């Protein structure tokens, strides 16, 4: 279980606390500039006291923020929003670089994990392509595969948390479906998943818990159906939303 205690980043993110249980999928939602990316970066440990970050992130009996970067990498995976790297390798080599330290891609368990993740995000025909020749959606699927291999339990038994900052942004509708299959596979291993997300209907369907941010403040948290209420969304997003039932599932319709 992850326990976040009074995490804050200067005036960008005021102190907030919450928990993420093992295998729980928590979505962080809110308008642009509400503090979603700042919160995830602070929890990941990439923002430090020099950046104005404070608070504690406890994973089991460890404060993640006091660990070295290499120790953090064994406990959590973090996919931020970023452009393509300057170096050039093929997809298979990139995935090999993403594996936890001390593992070899020739190991049977590692090979099985790589094959499973590659199949989940449908990269089988891309393994020998240069990462610089991939489309935006293809490259994002490679990044997702890499960060998931970092925390995949059969090759990294110490992993506890996966943090994804707007992972669906470069993906089309079909690829977005693959993303949520991958998230489900990670959560099924008992790993908590923290996702910054803009598609509120996806949040209604997939999130076990939701944090709704507004101007760096935690507006509300809890079950998706409760947090994403018509009144709460109108207050935070300054727009009207209606919640309707289709095939016994709730959907949001925005004016």
Swiss-Prot record:
Subcellular location, record wording: Cell inner membrane
Cited SMART domains: AAA
Pfam families listed in its UniProt record: ABC_tran
Subunit structure: The complex is composed of two ATP-binding proteins (BtuD), two transmembrane proteins (BtuC) and a solute-binding protein (BtuF).
Species assigned in the record: Vibrio parahaemolyticus serotype O3:K6 (strain RIMD 2210633)
Identification of the protein by name: Vitamin B12 import ATP-binding protein BtuD
UniProt entry tagged with the keyword Protease: no
Keyword annotations from UniProtKB, A to Z: ATP-binding, Cell inner membrane, Cell membrane, Membrane, Nucleotide-binding, Translocase, Transport
InterPro entries xrefs: AAA+_ATPase, ABC_transporter-like_ATP-bd, ABC_transptr_BtuD, Metal_Ion_Import_ABC, P-loop_NTPase
Domain ABC transporter: 2-240
High-level lineage: Bacteria, Pseudomonadati, Pseudomonadota, Gammaproteobacteria, Vibrionales
Keyword Transport applies: yes
Main localization of the protein described in the UniProt heading: membrane
